[in-house]
């Protein structure tokens, strides 16, 4: 690991949380790794912000890009463990830490994920000590091998706009899973390092998810999300259950760049 250069990348809305900053100040650097340089991109469109940060990582010749969202609370050894997993396998392009959705319902990682039908995805099985092969991890805490990005054509981070018509609700999502799919298509691997347990801070409730960490008996089997009476929960994977029907329509987004 000696001589590895790592860029810390933060895509922020402009108001980083206090728990994020406190944890960042306690982050341990792996042996032989120079002090972290930082690239912070402020805005309200995460894919473009990640694009700016990746441009910095490529232009400045970093070995790894360490994405951390400004509402994620890292354990002190997060970077040490993620780098250990990445260095053990040069074919691993992305290693993600474990964190949950703010409602504590699900870990942010997917198996059997496909960009043309996201309803095929489920939550992969993992244990507290595993570095499991998965299809995608959240980039709230993720270490990316920069050399694998060089095999892709920019822009590096496409995105989905998820439209819930009955609820009249729209959200941007999946730039992390789509990047993972792109590098997997190039023959690389994506791993979830469940040793890295990150809290996901909610500004509104001033609390962190998960409310309670699941044990191996719960996480050691593949699971799927079901919606019942307005709430969601995880249940063991059952491929016979009908999936939500999706329709996909492409809409152009043009990046206009100025100096």
Predicted regions span which residues?
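Hydrophobic pocket-lining residues that define ligand/cofactor binding sites across diverse proteins
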Residues: 57, 86, 183
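Short beta-strand-to-loop acidic/aromatic patch adjacent to the donor-nucleotide binding site
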Residues: 62-73
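C-terminal catalytic/acceptor-binding lobe
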Residues: 155-247, 251-258
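Active-site nucleotide-sugar/metal-binding loop of Leloir-type enzymes
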Residues: 52-64
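A short, glycine-/small-residue-rich helix N-cap motif at loop->alpha-helix starts
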Residues: 44-49
């Amino acid at each position: 690991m000696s001589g590895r250069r790592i860029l810390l990348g933060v895509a922020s809305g402009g108001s980083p949380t206090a728990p994020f900053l406190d944890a960042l100040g306690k982050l341990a650097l792996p042996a032989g790794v120079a002090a972290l340089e930082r690239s912070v991109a402020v805005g309200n469109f995460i894919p473009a912000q990640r694009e700016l940060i990746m441009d910095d990582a490529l232009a400045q010749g970093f070995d790894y890009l360490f994405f951390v969202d400004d509402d994620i609370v890292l354990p002190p050894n997060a970077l040490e463990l993620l780098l250990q997993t990445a260095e053990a396998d040069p074919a691993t392009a992305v290693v993600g830490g474990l964190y949950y959705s703010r409602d504590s319902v699900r870990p942010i990682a997917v198996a059997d994920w496909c960009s043309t039908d996201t309803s095929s995805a489920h939550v992969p099985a993992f244990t507290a000590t595993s570095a499991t092969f998965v299809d995608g991890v959240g980039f709230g805490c993720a270490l990316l091998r920069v050399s694998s990005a060089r095999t892709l054509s920019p822009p590096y981070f496409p995105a989905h706009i998820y439209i819930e018509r009955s609820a009249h609700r729209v959200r941007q999502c999946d730039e992390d899973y789509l990047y993972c799919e792109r590098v997997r298509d190039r023959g690389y691997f994506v791993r979830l390092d469940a040793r890295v347990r990150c809290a996901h801070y909610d500004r509104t409730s001033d609390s962190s998810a998960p409310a309670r960490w699941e044990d191996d008996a719960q996480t050691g089997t593949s699971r799927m999300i079901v919606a019942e009476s307005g709430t969601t929960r995880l249940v063991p994977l059952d491929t016979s259950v009908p999936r939500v029907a999706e329709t996909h329509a492409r809409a152009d987004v043009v990046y206009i760049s100025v100096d």
